[in-house]
Curated annotation (Swiss-Prot):
Topological relation to the membrane, as annotated: Single-pass membrane protein
Similarity comment: Belongs to the UPF0154 family.
CC annotations in GO: plasma membrane
Localization (cell): Cell membrane
Pfam annotation, one family: UPF0154
Transmembrane segments: 3-23
Principal subcellular localisation of the protein: membrane
Protein source organism: Latilactobacillus sakei subsp. sakei (strain 23K)
Name used for this protein in its record: UPF0154 protein LCA_1273
Domain of life: Bacteria
Region (Disordered): 55-76
Length: 76
């Protein structure tokens, strides 16, 4: 009887911990992406205009592909 109650308490605790961890991680990621949004083409276009460059479609595509390639290399 005591072993069964111990196992039940352990299972309930593990489930509660998993649910709390999921929602905690979800809230953290939402906050992180609000503070640090991923770079998109519109942001690159604005940065290029601020630097005095004319943002052509070719340049934007080159910059986006180089950023994606750099992200892939850094993940390895």
């Amino acid at each position: 009887m005591n072993i069964g109650i111990g196992v039940l308490i352990f299972v309930i605790g593990a489930l509660l911990g998993a649910v709390a961890g999921f929602f905690g991680a979800r809230a953290y990621m939402k906050k992180y992406f609000e503070e640090n949004p991923p770079v998109n083409e519109d942001m690159l276009k604005a940065m290029m205009m601020q630097m005095g460059q004319k943002p052509s479609e070719k340049k934007l595509n080159q910059m986006m592909s180089s950023m994606k390639a750099q992200q892939k290399r850094s993940k390895k």
